[in-house]
């Protein structure tokens, strides 16, 4: 793949002004990866999102609920960065998998080893009553194969919609990927937000981060 030079990289989906025909074979390509590329991608996306909240006075004093956070190596560096700026943030990291030990013993970080469902979200809402919640979701179930199936994706999106509806966060950053054309099952709803492109994404990627900078009732 040839590099493309531009004055400013595309940041959002609606900035893309061209298109390619879908070719199922492109998903079989194995692009070269940097060491820890996945964690670096998350670091860049979440630093952008949280910095914007900080500039608008939303971040200080908030509770960040991060669902699907493991291993979360990059979160330690996000936490240290905003702590050095004097911001008071409580982090609640939730995943059924184990987190990186680098996150152990941090007084402002709570690690919860659990897969999330609607009933747990309702319990969490009661525990965080009157807290200013910022929601980050990187839920990604996979029932076999190298990539999540369309049914996995739809289940994840339904759960994310439930999280936003119940927690009523001041802002949200939600992961989602549009099913490929030959894997489409049915139409679905996602919250209306700013559809940000992800760093290092291959040309066939249909994955974005949906950033919502408002606590107003969601629009699907």
Curated annotation (Swiss-Prot):
Location of this chain's protein in the cell: Virion
Catalytic residues of the enzyme: 175
Catalysed reaction, written as an equation: a 5'-end (N(7)-methyl 5'-triphosphoguanosine)-ribonucleoside in mRNA + S-adenosyl-L-methionine = a 5'-end (N(7)-methyl 5'-triphosphoguanosine)-(2'-O-methyl-ribonucleoside) in mRNA + S-adenosyl-L-homocysteine + H(+)
Lineage of the organism: Viruses, Varidnaviria, Bamfordvirae, Nucleocytoviricota, Pokkesviricetes
Record-level GO cellular component terms: virion component
Species annotation: Sheeppox virus (strain KS-1) (SPPV)
Binding site for mRNA: 22, 177-180, 182, 205-207
Keywords: Elongation factor, Methyltransferase, mRNA capping, mRNA processing, Protein biosynthesis, S-adenosyl-L-methionine, Transcription, Transferase, Virion
Enzyme class label: transferase
Top-level division of the source organism's lineage: Viruses
Binding site for S-adenosyl-L-methionine: 39, 66, 68, 72, 95, 97, 116, 138
Family label: Belongs to the class I-like SAM-binding methyltransferase superfamily. Poxvirus/kinetoplastid 2'-O-MTase family.
Pfam family of the protein (one): PARP_regulatory
Biological process terms in GO annotation: 7-methylguanosine mRNA capping; methylation; regulation of mRNA 3'-end processing
EC number in record: 2.1.1.57
Role, per record: Displays methyltransferase, positive regulation of the poly(A) polymerase and transcription elongation activities. Involved in the modification of both mRNA ends and in intermediate and late gene positive transcription elongation. At the mRNAs 5' end, methylates the ribose 2' OH group of the first transcribed nucleotide, thereby producing a 2'-O-methylpurine cap. At the 3' end, functions as a processivity factor which stimulates the activity of the viral poly(A) polymerase OPG063 that creates mRNA's poly(A) tail.
One MF annotation (Gene Ontology) recorded for this entry: mRNA (nucleoside-2'-O-)-methyltransferase activity
Protein name: Cap-specific mRNA (nucleoside-2'-O-)-methyltransferase
Subunit structure: Interacts with poly(A) polymerase catalytic subunit OPG063. Interacts with OPG109 and OPG123; these interactions might help linking transcription to capping and polyadenylation.
Chief location category: virion
């Amino acid at each position: 793949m040839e590099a493309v030079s531009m004055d400013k990289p595309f940041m959002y989906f609606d900035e893309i002004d061209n298109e390619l025909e879908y070719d199922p074979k492109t998903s079989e390509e194995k692009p070269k990866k940097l060491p820890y590329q996945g964690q670096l991608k998350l670091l860049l996306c979440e630093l952008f999102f949280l910095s914007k909240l900080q500039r608008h006075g939303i971040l200080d004093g908030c509770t960040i609920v991060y669902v699907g956070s493991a291993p979360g190596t990059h979160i330690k560096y996000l936490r240290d960065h905003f702590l050095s700026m004097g911001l008071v943030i409580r982090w609640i990291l939730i995943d059924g998998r184990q987190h990186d030990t680098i996150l152990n013993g941090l007084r402002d970080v709570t690690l919860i080893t659990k897969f999330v469902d609607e009933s747990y979200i309702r319990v969490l809402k009661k525990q965080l009553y009157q807290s200013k919640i910022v929601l980050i979701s990187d839920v990604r179930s996979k029932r076999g194969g190298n990539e999540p199936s369309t049914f996995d994706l739809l289940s994840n999106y339904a759960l994310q919609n439930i999280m936003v509806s119940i927690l009523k966060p001041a802002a949200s950053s939600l992961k989602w990927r549009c099913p490929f054309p030959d894997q489409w099952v049915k139409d679905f709803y996602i919250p209306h937000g700013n559809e940000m492109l992800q760093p290092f994404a291959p040309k066939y990627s249909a994955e974005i981060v949906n950033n919502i900078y408002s606590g107003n009732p969601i629009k699907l």
